[in-house]
Design a protein with these regions (language model features):
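PLP-dependent enzyme catalytic core of the Aspartate aminotransferase-like
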Residues: 1, 332-363
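A glycine-/small-polar-enriched, mobile loop at the entrance of the PLP active site in fold-type I
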Residues: 2-57
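Active-site C-terminal subdomain of aminotransferase-like
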Residues: 13-14, 190-276
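Conserved beta-loop-alpha segment that forms the PLP phosphate-binding cup at the N-terminus of a helix
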Residues: 52-79, 83, 87-91
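Active-site phosphate-binding strand-loop segment of PLP-dependent enzymes
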Residues: 112-171
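Conserved active-site segment immediately N-terminal to the catalytic lysine
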Residues: 178-190
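Conserved PLP-binding catalytic core of the aspartate aminotransferase-like
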Residues: 284-314
Length: 363
């Protein structure tokens, strides 16, 4: 199969060196070699999450750890903050786990604002809140530090579990778990980590670990306490994705060698260039001004281009970008990912190909 360079918001482009790292000889997950591998990974993960607390490792998707966060941290009632398809998934998971909840919904393309959270938490009946840092469907980054401040200042705010989905932003955006006072911050490998899918990670606060001890029916596979028990021994409760763990170890080395500050700056520069390109052609940014994602830009299809036709053309040039997500935004928007290990030269290659298509197909 020919290589198609991915400018989609996951799975993302994976470098050959990372693919090669998976080709190491197989080992058993209870062998000392696997323990050594996990021991190498753990401190580097904490650096990327910017935390001194635990970062759990799960052989699952990010959605799996979203479910884990709900099962381990919600005892009374949870507020689901929805401004797109993936924040809506928080609500679906909450309902699927029969947790009492309310929804704070805003127009897609808009951020969740602190005053909205303050108003909804005023009743004092919530013990958790679900937030999405980077709404992949709309290209909106929610103002998490300001939202945390609103939560902590609400009734019983110091006891409210702040659960944050950073699946499409962590390792591409500056997210400070300890400094921001979060309780669960989760992500997975196939987005800004620029790895194949198959692993997910969650930084979990000491406060959240204590809360989990009070929650019945946490299950087993996604039980934070079980995951932590094995993690402290540099092990996993069940067979992990060993080949992907090799790739993770290599990629963490490379991420830290680049430097987190430099990595975040590269993502912002690619974001700014993408917006510049789109505006030069007359496309409107779908995200509200000031809340544009550093990892994926969503454009309104206000010029009514044939997005499927554009992607068909891009495939002839060895690349692909993304249509709008789901029935609500498909063909109404399109998305260009600029995350992971993509470089500015990759973006320019994409824009040159898109320029070629638009020159022939725009009236």
């Amino acid at each position: 199969m020919p290589h198609i360079k991915l400018f989609i918001p996951g799975p993302t482009e994976v470098r050959p060196e990372i693919l090669d790292a998976q080709a190491a000889w197989m080992i058993g997950h209870r062998m000392p070699e696997c323990t050594e591998l996990i021991s190498s990974i753990r401190p580097k993960l904490r650096q990327v999450f910017q935390t001194e607390q635990q970062v759990l490792i799960s052989a699952s998707t990010g959605s799996g750890l979203m479910e884990a966060a709900i099962r381990n941290c919600v005892g009374k009632k949870v507020l689901n903050c929805v401004n797109g398809a993936f924040s809506e998934r928080w609500h679906e998971i909450v309902v699927g786990n029969a947790k009492d909840n309310e929804v704070l919904a805003v127009e897609w393309g808009q951020p969740i604002l602190p005053e909205q959270v303050t108003e909804r938490l005023a009743s004092g009946e919530f013990d958790a809140i679900c937030l999405t840092h980077n709404e992949t469907s709309t290209g909106v980054t929610n103002p998490i530090p300001e939202l945390v401040q609103a939560v902590r200042q609400s009734p019983n705010g110091d006891q409210i579990m702040i659960l944050v989905d950073a699946v499409s932003s962590l390792a591409g955006a500056d997210i400070r778990f300890d400094e921001w006072d979060l309780d669960v911050l989760l992500t997975s490998t196939q987005k800004a980590f620029a790895l194949p899918p198959g692993l997910a990670f969650a930084a979990v606060s000491n406060r959240a670990m204590e809360k989990a001890k009070t929650i019945p029916d946490r299950g087993w596979y996604f039980d934070f306490l079980t995951l932590e028990k094995y993690l402290l021994k540099d092990q996993t409760p069940s067979t992990t994705v060993v080949s992907l763990m090799y790739a993770l170890d290599k990629q963490l080395d490379d991420i830290l060698a680049e430097g987190l500050e430099a990595r975040f700056a590269r993502h912002l520069a690619m974001r700014d260039r993408t917006i510049e390109w789109g505006k030069a052609h007359g496309f409107e940014v779908f995200a509200a001004a000031g809340y544009e994602s550093p990892t994926v830009t969503c454009f309104a299809n206000n010029l009514h281009i044939d997005i499927s036709g554009l992607n068909k053309f891009l495939r002839t040039r060895g690349m692909i970008m993304s249509n709008g997500y789901g029935s609500k935004l498909k063909n109404v928007t399109f998305r260009i990912a600029h995350m992971g290990d993509l470089q500015m030269s990759d973006m320019e290659e994409l824009f040159a190909a898109m320029d070629e298509y638009l020159a022939e197909n725009l009236d």
